[in-house]
Amino acid sequence: MPQPTRPYSFMELCREYTLEQLLKFLNVTLDTLMLPCHFCSSFMDLNNKASYLASQLKVIVKDCCFKGACIKCRRKLAFAERQKYQVCVGEADLVEAMVGSHVINLTVRCSECLALLTASEKLDAKCELQTFILVRHMWRTSCRACRTPAIEC
């Protein structure tokens, strides 16, 4: 006789949510959601939450709490992952030859802040002959925000 499947808990269901999906599911706004950083435990300010939202990373569920990752910790994590899990490095032409598809069709994250690159950012990276790095089965290169030097007033 087949075993009955255990119903998923609320937290297990939300484990696969991006921050945008979680906000819709909970029917709350970004500014009202209290979201701690998984790595440093500080509560993320509105700018950090907006950056996390734009990156389209999944919400972390730990100890019955939803958590994100602040930009400072995401930068540290991206650096550590590059150091430990970098597989190969090449320009977009090499990437396209390896995967058999145009870079615009690939999921590419920023090698510095883990943001999800837009189609135009991927095309810019290809035209500018930027380096693409394979880290944990995911291609990475710098996003527009990380490539652009900060303007000082």
Curated annotation (Swiss-Prot):
GO terms for cellular component: host cell cytoplasm; host cell nucleus. One of its GO terms (biological process) is symbiont-mediated perturbation of host ubiquitin-like protein modification. It is found in: Host cytoplasm; Host nucleus. Its main location: host cell. Pfam families: E6. A zinc finger (unnamed) spans 37-73, 110-146. GO terms for molecular function: DNA binding; zinc ion binding. The keyword Repeat does not apply. Keywords: Activator, DNA-binding, Early protein, Host cytoplasm, Host nucleus, Host-virus interaction, Inhibition of host innate immune response by virus, Metal-binding, Modulation of host cell apoptosis by virus, Transcription, Transcription regulation, Viral immunoevasion, Zinc, Zinc-finger. InterPro entries: E6, E6_sf. Disulfide bonds: none annotated. The keyword Kinase does not apply. Forms homodimers. Interacts with ubiquitin-protein ligase UBE3A/E6-AP; this interaction stimulates UBE3A ubiquitin activity. Interacts with host BAK1. Plays a major role in the induction and maintenance of cellular transformation. E6 associates with host UBE3A/E6-AP ubiquitin-protein ligase and modulates its activity. Protects host keratinocytes from apoptosis by mediating the degradation of host BAK1. May also inhibit host immune response. Belongs to the papillomaviridae E6 protein family. This is Protein E6. It comes from Micromys minutus papillomavirus.
